[in-house]
Amino acid sequence: MKKGLFALALGTFTLGMAEFIIEGILTDVAHDMNVSIPQAGHLISIYALGVCAGAFSLILMHKYRPKKILLFLTSLVTLGAVIATIAPSYWLLLCARFVQGLPHGAYFGTGTIVAVKMAKEGKGTKAVAMMCAGMPFANLMGVPLGTFLSHAFSWRVPFLMSVALGIITLYMIYKWVPEVEALPNKG
């Protein structure tokens, strides 16, 4: 696997962690934040709302090079994880989850373009599949690990793990993802 594709896949893994980690730690969060489990469940819904709202951000970012967009989006999900890690209140944690959701759709759209452009002729589909592989790995490995860390230490530790993943992903995208042309604006 090319290093650039690995960086993109780590980005989807990081997004998958951001999206799904809450499911394994929901009861710990509810207990610590002194809210009911159904109320803590809004932390899942608000992420989805962020995904929907953030999908439109590509309209505003179309003039920038895809690598810069990926760096910005990865920074945003990492910022959300930082806020979640230190959130002193349920309401700030809700805001953090919304911020974490914002880059989701735009990252996949931009990452797909970059993966195809990085691929050899006729291998674009394989490159996109490799990039998207991070998401199921987040479910398979990241969520159980995050749940274990939450139960063993604190629900904040999995978010801290997301911060570390985000920083590593930023470095890898910066170092290994090539500059590709922005898509032409057709309308």
Where are these predicted regions, by residue range?
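Extracytoplasmic
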Residues: 4-40
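Helix-breaking motifs and short loop linkers at transmembrane-helix boundaries and internal kinks
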Residues: 34, 86-92
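Short hydrophobic/small-residue motifs within alpha-helical transmembrane segments
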Residues: 47-49, 136-137
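Helix-to-loop junctions at the C-terminal end of transmembrane segments
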Residues: 54-66
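Structural signature of the two symmetry-related core transmembrane helices
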Residues: 69-82
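Paired small-residue
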Residues: 80, 91-100
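Helix-loop-helix hairpin linking two adjacent transmembrane segments in secondary transporters
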Residues: 92, 130-175
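Cytoplasmic helix-loop-helix junction between adjacent transmembrane helices
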Residues: 96-134
